[in-house]
Amino acid sequence: MSEIGERVKKIVVEHLGVEPEKVVDNASFIDDLGADSLDTVELVMAFEEEFGCEIPDDAAETILTVGDATKFLEKNAKS
């Protein structure tokens, strides 16, 4: 997993309180990790803060899995 992927994983574990082993690229935030819509909004905000970038609403709607978040942030992260 990339350095950005590891940071994404850490944020997901902290925000959702899930076991690190469950946070894999194809894990759906809602279906696999038990997030609700508020959790997903909070995750997006945490990603924006951690990586110094804005995630527009239309992009946020396409970030459904850990891998989706990692791919988006690898392209758009400022830090």
Swiss-Prot record:
PROSITE patterns for the chain: CARRIER (PS50075), PHOSPHOPANTETHEINE (PS00012)
Compartment(s): Cytoplasm
Gene Ontology terms: biological process: lipid A biosynthetic process
One Gene Ontology cellular component: membrane
Gene3D superfamilies given in the database record: ACP-like (1.10.1200.10)
O-(pantetheine 4'-phosphoryl)serine PTM sites in chain numbering: S37
Keyword Phosphoprotein attributed: yes
Alphabetic keyword roster: Cytoplasm, Fatty acid biosynthesis, Fatty acid metabolism, Lipid biosynthesis, Lipid metabolism, Phosphopantetheine, Phosphoprotein
Main location, first listed in the record: cytoplasm
Pathways involved: Lipid metabolism; fatty acid biosynthesis
Carrier domain ranges (all copies): 2-77
GO MF annotation list: acyl binding; acyl carrier activity
Domain of life: Bacteria
The record's account of how the chain is modified after translation: 4'-phosphopantetheine is transferred from CoA to a specific serine of apo-ACP by AcpS. This modification is essential for activity because fatty acids are bound in thioester linkage to the sulfhydryl of the prosthetic group.
NCBIfam families, alphabetized: acyl_carrier, PRK00982.1-2, PRK00982.1-3, PRK00982.1-4, PRK00982.1-5
Family: Belongs to the acyl carrier protein (ACP) family.
Protein name: Acyl carrier protein
Gene source species: Bradyrhizobium sp. (strain ORS 278)
